[in-house]
Design a protein with these regions (language model features):
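S-adenosyl-L-methionine
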Residues: 1-96, 132-178, 185, 211-218
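Intrinsically disordered, low-complexity terminal tails and inter-domain linkers enriched
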Residues: 6-29, 168-220
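Mobile active-site "lid"/loop adjacent to the S-adenosyl-L-methionine
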Residues: 228-259
């Protein structure tokens, strides 16, 4: 069975608790349904207590938001560079921008954004990583200190590039439809002005059509967040031997230009790109500005014409 044929839900459904005798005695029947290449590498998934866990027989890794609680305190959140990067001043009613995290991983960056009040749509293409993240979100939803933020995080197991392009197409279709309705309404208004006394019924109907246009408006994505795997480096927050487990599943970004073009096609008001502090720009695209940390920086591409107010 190919990795593409195994969904995160199938993986979750196939999980069995770890036998009391320990990891090494776990039979093949008790292991999760995994891609053949993962099993060949000696990796397996099991339930360690309440947590879905990835192991190579020596090291283990699971999604865990509980260790982030200190960072999620309001005073600390305000100092997070990513939270600062996600600000857009021109939105109406001081609402928080809606964010699409196109490279979710284990979701730690998205948790920061959700704790800051953002709705976050998370995309993770690797089914095993998506399963680890889904399990972490399940446990977070049961933790009073994390439940509110977890409730703003919506996980999609799949290819974010395809999702962003499909979103762009939907927005284009909706914009075209709205433009056609608006044009028709304007033509109706002109006709009404010429024969207001004899065509009042047509005038009333045109007004009704205008109301329907507002109701059909799609919820827009304001910000797209990209944190692709950088060759020779790794995502911040995952270090040492535990990271090596995840690295066997998640490969460096194969085509930076394709990822960037998919994000641009969705026409967000801002694209935020997480990079190593001294790393090159993603796809060679110079940002509008950058926020620099000790080990990482956030390159921000701003598109005022795309602000969804």
């Amino acid at each position: 069975m190919k990795a593409s044929e195994i969904s995160s839900q199938k993986i979750m459904d196939s999980i069995r608790p770890l036998p009391e005798a320990g990891k090494q005695e776990q039979s093949s029947a008790e292991r999760a349904l995994l891609p053949p290449e993962m099993e060949a590498a000696g990796l397996s998934l099991f339930m360690d207590g309440d947590a879905l866990t990835l192991t190579d027989g020596t090291n283990t890794l699971c999604g865990d938001f509980t260790r982030m609680k200190k960072r999620l305190r309001e005073a600390n959140l305000r100092q997070e560079l990513l939270v600062k990067a996600a600000r857009i001043k021109s939105l109406q009613d001081d609402r928080k921008p809606v964010i699409l995290d196109a490279t979710a991983g284990l979701g730690e960056d998205s948790m920061l954004l959700a704790a800051a009040g953002h709705q976050v749509e998370l995309y993770e293409r690797d089914p095993v990583i998506a399963a680890l993240l889904a399990d972490a979100l399940r446990r977070a939803a049961e933790d009073p200190a994390l439940a509110e933020a977890a409730g703003r995080m919506h996980l999609h197991s799949g290819d974010s590039e395809a999702a962003m392009r499909e979103y762009a197409q939907r927005m284009h279709r909706e914009t075209t439809k709205k433009s056609e309705i608006c044009l028709q309404n304007k033509e109706d208004v002109k006709a009404e002005e010429k024969c207001a006394e004899t065509q009042k019924r047509d005038s009333d109907q045109a007004g009704m059509n205008g109301d329907e246009t507002a109701d059909a408006e799609l919820t827009a994505i304001d910000i797209i967040y990209l944190d692709p795997m950088f060759p020779g480096r790794h995502k911040s927050g995952l270090v040492g031997k535990k990271f090596q487990l995840l690295q066997q599943l998640e490969s460096p970004c194969a085509d930076e230009e394709e990822l960037m073009q998919a994000a641009l096609a969705a026409e967000p008001a801002k694209i935020i790109i997480k990079r190593p502090a001294k790393g090159p720009y993603l796809a060679g695209r110079k940002p509008s500005y950058s926020l620099m940390g000790k080990t990482v920086r956030y390159d921000c591409l701003v598109f005022p014409e795309n602000h969804h107010v």
